[in-house]
Design a protein with these regions (language model features):
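Active-site-proximal alpha-helix that buttresses catalytic centers in soluble enzyme cores
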Residues: 2-352
Length: 352
């Protein structure tokens, strides 16, 4: 073909000459996409309904036949639950929006400032709501990323969370003719950098308290027990995180209590339940309590409202005297250390 009819592809990532009328193709970059659970666009009824419909329609979250479940979900549940959930979100909503969205955005910005470059691009998405995984994958690809590493920001693996992110990631790829190479990151429930960060945040919080806790409650988001029975490793990974943190801080074997929160529906979930434990502890002599939420790298509805507000009310009404919740790592330098460690490990061979 004559030289006048061809031109080179944009470098890096040269794949040879292209016709002169071919669209510009940018390649050779590596993308990192941080993904957390998601958040509604607002606290109003319809924003909440859209978000809950997407979230609760995920077959990874609710493992029942979808035709039957959708009749229940789109009927009574989404008639009443959006208003209730909206009231809860209003308690924690900021001028900048959802705390989870804000912290995830800041994490991406801080990570970009540390390790981002023209070759390594960093962005974030939400598994439910906005910004969506498909939109951010398309953006990274348009920016020249032919290799993308997706980082689910869940310390402990569960099919309800990590696997759902992977499902939605690869579902988005189905619509791409020219797909980027993909990697998904493993859980980090026992990674030393995460255990160090979590232990240090707890230690610092305890030092600043005006009381000495009788026990520390490690509250993780729950999953139905049936999922555990089918082989979900989440329960085991939660207990391992608790054990490693307790060992790091030199706690006695029974000082840390592992519980599970946020159960939904009539079925049995992982136990012991956080709310029932909070109600029972004062009668067992535990009057001063500190609560940690190791399943969440960022503060969200479950930590700011369910634990910090409802949890304190439950504990104090049952006879507790002092109660404090350790903030999540959020966008602290320690949080970025954890995420950077994951990214460097998972992009080995792609990014130097």
């Amino acid at each position: 073909m004559p030289d006048t009819m061809t031109r080179p592809i944009n470098r890096p990532g040269d794949v040879g000459p292209l016709p002169t009328d071919h669209p510009v193709v940018v390649q050779g970059k590596v993308g990192v996409l941080l993904v957390n659970l998601g958040t509604p666009d607002g606290t109003d009824y319809w924003s909440m309904r859209r978000y809950l419909s997407e979230f609760l329609s995920d077959p990874r979250v609710i493992e029942v036949p979808q035709p039957i479940w959708q009749l229940i979900l789109q009927g009574p549940i989404l008639t009443f639950r959006p208003s209730k959930s909206g009231r809860a979100y209003k308690k924690i909503w900021t001028k900048e929006g959802s705390p989870l969205l804000l912290y995830t955005m800041r994490q991406a910005e801080a990570l970009k400032a540390r390790i981002g470059s023209d070759h390594l691009l960093v962005d974030f998405a939400m598994n439910y709501g906005n910004p969506s995984i498909p939109s951010k994958l398309a953006k990274l690809k348009a920016q020249g990323c032919d290799r993308i590493c997706v980082i689910p920001l869940y310390p402990q693996y569960s099919a309800t969370t990590t696997a759902s992110v992977c499902d939605r990631t690869f579902k988005a790829l189905e619509k791409m003719r020219w797909q980027p190479a993909m990697r998904t990151a493993a859980s980090f429930h026992d990674q030393p950098v995460y255990i160090d960060a979590l232990a240090n945040s707890i230690s610092t919080h305890l030092e600043d308290l005006e009381f000495t806790p009788d026990r520390v409650l490690m509250s993780y988001h729950g999953i139905p027990k049936a999922y555990f029975d089918k082989g979900d490793p989440y329960h085991c990974q939660c207990h391992k995180t608790t054990r490693l943190v307790a060992e790091q801080l030199g706690w006695a074997d029974d000082f840390a209590i592992t519980t599970f929160q946020s159960r939904f529906g009539p079925t049995q979930w992982l136990q012991p339940y956080t709310d029932k434990t909070l109600e029972a502890l004062p009668s067992e002599g535990v009057k001063n309590l500190v609560v940690v939420s190791p399943a969440f790298i960022s503060d969200c509805l479950e930590t700011l409202e369910e634990l910090a507000m409802e949890g304190e009310e439950e504990f104090m009404e049952a006879g507790g005297e002092a109660y404090s919740v350790v903030p999540c790592l959020n966008d602290s330098p320690a949080a970025i250390d954890v995420i950077e460690d994951i990214v460097r490990r998972e992009t080995a061979g792609w990014a130097n």
